[in-house]
Curated annotation (Swiss-Prot):
Chain's gene name: murG
Protein name: UDP-N-acetylglucosamine--N-acetylmuramyl-(pentapeptide) pyrophosphoryl-undecaprenol N-acetylglucosamine transferase
Keyword terms, alphabetized: Cell cycle, Cell division, Cell membrane, Cell shape, Cell wall biogenesis/degradation, Glycosyltransferase, Membrane, Peptidoglycan synthesis, Transferase
Enzyme class: transferase
Family affiliation: Belongs to the glycosyltransferase 28 family. MurG subfamily.
Native organism: Wolbachia sp. subsp. Brugia malayi (strain TRS)
Residues binding UDP-N-acetyl-alpha-D-glucosamine: 10-12, 113, 174, 275
């Protein structure tokens, strides 16, 4: 085995690892994902599932599973004998990175967010290289920290300006998605009728909320398409005139590289407040607006949507401003580093 990728937890950690695994395979190298139960199965990517669940609720059970996962990871890594372990942060990467450290296997870390996460911070001194997704990453200082970019499979494409219907793409992410299903949908359905008639909503929606949200849009006379997950995000972004999203690092990278204007609503309970720092980096570019999830969110979001959806030139200006943002797809550059490390 050439490379083990340590990931899991949320899509922000998982999807960059999957993108990198596919790129590694195209270069003729072998890799496997070590992740938790949330990762799911990807037929074209090898994976090994650790029996971890998200921390919360029964903490004693979580720590028992964490210890068990560390033992399993140590056994599997010793058996596979990889030349390199790449960690993507998050609690689910801890057992695999610990095994690599114990077995003296070279470690590279990839940090998706604008603030170094707790697991990556823990293994900072053990890593040979820390690849960052933002030009400036809080707590990631020193010569071994290199701005590489995030790993996404998105390319900028222009959409037809002749379309009279504006597509609003809503990406809830895996954290705090109920808020988008309840609050954001409600705000859109209470916009002035002249705006509701000229928009089409494409929304990532929790399965349990699907009927409720669909009924809400139907009652508000808003054309909608709902899905629990979009596996063609590149196409969805191409069709979008405006994106409403959490401020996860991978979402920001995809939206920015697709050259789309956005409204970011940072998840207020994100670890180390990383979504706030991600959004802080973006907000001064003129390509996006940040709305805080607080008691004023409905009023602020309503005012913003009325202004943006009523001004197509403003949306085009915001899209052009994405070019100013130093967000890049780092797959090619990172692969060169990995190949050099493998010798």
């Amino acid at each position: 085995m050439d490379i083990v990728l340590a990931t899991g937890g949320t899509g922000g950690h998982i999807f960059p690892a999957i993108t990198l695994a596919r790129a590694i395979k195209r270069q003729g190298y072998d890799s496997i994902l070590f992740a938790d139960k949330k990762t799911g199965k990807n037929t074209d990517v090898k994976d090994y599932t650790l029996p971890l669940n998200k921390p919360g609720g029964n903490k004693f059970r979580f720590f028992l599973l964490l210890i068990y996962s560390c033992v399993l990871a140590l056994y599997q890594i010793r058996k596979l004998k990889p030349k390199l372990v790449i960690g993507f942060g998050g609690y689910a990467s801890f057992p695999t990175l610990l095994a690599a450290k114990v077995l003296s296997i070279p470690i590279i870390l990839h940090e998706q967010n604008a603030v170094l996460g707790r697991v990556n911070k823990f293994f900072f001194n053990s890593a040979e290289l820390i690849a960052t997704s933002f030009p400036e990453t809080k707590y990631a200082k020193g010569n071994k920290c290199v701005f590489i970019g995030n790993f996404v499979d998105i390319k900028a494409k222009s959409h037809s300006s002749t379309k009279k219907i504006l597509t609003v793409l809503i990406i809830a992410g895996s954290q705090g998605a109920n808020f988008f299903d309840d609050v954001v949908s409600s705000v859109i359905c209470n916009l002035p009728i002249e705006i509701r008639k000229k928009i089409r909503v494409v929304q990532q929606c929790m399965k349990k909320n699907m009927n409720k949200v669909e009924g809400l849009y139907k009652g508000g006379q808003v054309i909608c398409e709902l899905s629990e997950f979009f596996d063609d995000m590149g196409s969805r972004l191409t069709d979008a005139h405006l994106v409403i999203s959490r401020a996860g690092a991978t979402s920001i990278a995809e939206i920015t590289l697709a050259r789309r204007p956005a409204i970011y609503i940072p998840y207020p309970c994100s670890k180390d407040d990383h979504q706030f720092y991600n959004a802080e980096y973006i907000k001064d570019s003129g390509a996006a607006v940040v709305v805080e999830q607080n008691s004023e969110v409905k009023k602020n979001l309503t005012k913003l949507l009325v202004n943006l959806l009523g001004d197509s030139q403003k949306l085009r200006d915001m899209a052009n401003n994405t070019k100013k943002i130093r967000i890049k797809n780092g797959v090619t550059e990172f692969i060169r580093i990995v190949i050099h490390k493998l010798g």
